[in-house]
Amino acid sequence: MGRLTQLAALVYVAVAVFACRERAQAVQSEAELKDMVHRMMPMVAQTTGLKFKREPLVLRRSRSQVRDYLIHKIDQDLPSTELAGLQSALRLFGLIPETLDLRPTLIDVLTEQVAGYYDPDSNALYIPEDVEPLQLRVVVSHELVHALQDQYVHLDSIIEQRHANDRRTAAQAILEGQAVVAQIPVLMPEQKPDTFPLGWFWQQRAAMAAQQSQMKQFASAPLWLREGLIFPYLGGADFVVWFRHKYLGRSVLDSMPQSTEQILHPERYASHDAPTELTFAAGEADTVEWEDNLGEYETRLLFQQLLGNEAEATTLATGWDGDRYQVLGAKKDVLVWYSVWDDAAAATRFAGGLQRAWAKRRAGVQTGRRAEVHQMVIDGRPVVRLVDAPADWKGWRALPTVRLSGGT
């Protein structure tokens, strides 16, 4: 999902619209838009505790220009070979249908959802011409926070981490979460997000999803894509509120969470519970076509997709401490996934759930494939390995192995 959430900053944050839309003032001309940005900057600076070092540009774009920008960013971030690898991984996990073509799906969904974006390369806010005037204050206030963030942390360096899906997703959650929390008092000065009960933003997920489900492309997208677009905003906002309570006066940008586990369980961040790193040993079993990790949040989504029960998915993914997978073979038809767990009980619970999920995934399908879920201990740590590959895959004779490092 980190690949996806690199683009999540482009997606219109609908949360604030519920409360703010009626009091927004219509803005029509580009001059009025620039004036809005200038007037909002002090408020954004105050609510974030950061000062603007420079004023961002603000420019209008047609919907076709927005689509062209999205295509450019997707192709830049995911060149064709990497896109093919990611698409194969998502298909092998069952997170997207075998027939789904990822690139046009991403382009269509994001084009439909975008209502403004900040581009670090040009230090500019871009507002589509077809955005309703009453939505502009919501869009501008959110993207202004991203412009300010870019003056303190290098946004591109955060979102361009390679093969570090979970860490990117966690970082994106901070960027989007801070923008959501910061824009609320800008739009509604009487509202104080720091007084919201912990978990309040995540509780708005159903309402946000319902609103977005009225959009054709979003409604027909896979669960992985729909939930992946929402998580950085709502999960990130809840973490930011927690952080502001816990670390009064500190900037959340100074010490980013390292995993979605830390976003989902802020106490893990406070206790410096860093994820365990898994590294595949060099071998000759097959050609590595793609490698990355899921993280706790996408592991939840995997179980939610395969078992259809969100509460059970949350339980099965809890206790995650690190994971790594490879897609192997010229046909990109082999999946090897290792995960390490906090304790043996969590590993056993996960392994049992994964066996049930995979049996359900492959039930009644004659695929000529073989799948194994195996528990083991590496360096004293409980580990679970999933292998799903053609039955005649040569790598079955000598499966890839991993080394563990770090973690707490």
Predicted regions, residues:
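Bacterial signal peptide processing site
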Residues: 21-23
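Auxiliary, metal-adjacent structural segments of Zn-dependent hydrolase domains
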Residues: 35-125, 129-134
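Post-HExxH zinc-binding segment in Zn-dependent metallohydrolases
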Residues: 40, 150-156, 160-208
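Active-site recognition of the HExxH zinc-binding catalytic motif
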Residues: 44, 138-155, 179-180, 240
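Acidic helix-start/capping segments at beta-turn-to-alpha-helix junctions
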Residues: 53-74, 162-166, 197-206, 257-261
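Short pre-active-site segment immediately N-terminal to the catalytic Zn-binding motif
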Residues: 125-141, 164-171
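Pan-zinc metallopeptidase signature
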Residues: 214-332, 338
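C-terminal soluble interaction/assembly domains
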Residues: 321-408
